[in-house]
Amino acid sequence: MMKDMRFILFYSEIDSFNFAADELEREFRLRGHEVFILDLKNPPEEDPHSYLHFTQFMAHKADAVVCFDGIGCREDLFIEIWDASGAVVIDILMDPPLRFHSTMEKHPANYFLFCCDLEHVEYVKKYFGQSVPYVAFMPHVGVMPSQERPVIPYTGRKYDVLFTGTYYHYQDRFVQIRQMFAEGSDMYRLYECMFDRLVCDSSLTIEKALLDTLEQFGWSVSEEMLKTMLRCSEAIDWTIRTYQRETVINTLAESGMELYLLGKGWKDYSGIRHSNVHIVDGWVDYRR
């Protein structure tokens, strides 16, 4: 039987991660473990999740730390604290690892990485096998609804189709490439062609699209240069995501189904001209 352990979790600006922290806290406590959630938004000292209460909790060492997307384990201060306590640090990447090269190169000593995509696991093994000795796949699943809350039949539900996520126009995301490379330069053209390739074939990963484009250009680069180019591909990753997101939403809007959009930026979406497209205003508290 596992001995009682002391866990550290985090609150941040990302609601989905905060929801996961609450779920983990509940499960850990049910199993008899101690849990402290540190609010990185730096609330007042009297707040139960403040840095003051964190310091008091750390008077006795923590056994394990659970992070999402490196939040709570990539900062120098936290690396020093976790190494001093000998804590096992579990980092769960919900987003592509190409966004977290620096975290995978510098992290606490007892660092265990999990990815929610098998291709992401292979990416880490391929490019960061030396600095990240342990990486594994963790399925991304939902949670069982409370038994106390009745299941609402589909005919009685408030929304036909609800999309939650931030809206950006994809061309606004591509601007980041212009900020890194002069328009018309060889590097700019390479990323431009890479994006076109992703539009034509949605099955491609960012890595495969870059490798194919390098072959098209006849370029041979070192592994370190390739890693740098992959890191710079974050802008392309965002651009193709927003392009495909808008494509899907346009299709739903034109289908005539009642579509509800929740998130930042949707007031700038051109499809709101459709009478069947509705914006859910405000912020929805995940705890409700």
Model region roles, listed by residue range:
Residues 130:
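Conserved catalytic or regulatory cores that recognize and/or transform ribose-phosphate-containing ligands
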Residues 3, 11-14, 18-20, 133-288:
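Nucleotide-sugar donor-binding catalytic core of glycosyltransferases
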Residues 6, 10, 17-127, 144-150, ...:
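Extended catalytic core of nucleotide-activated donor transferases of GT-like folds
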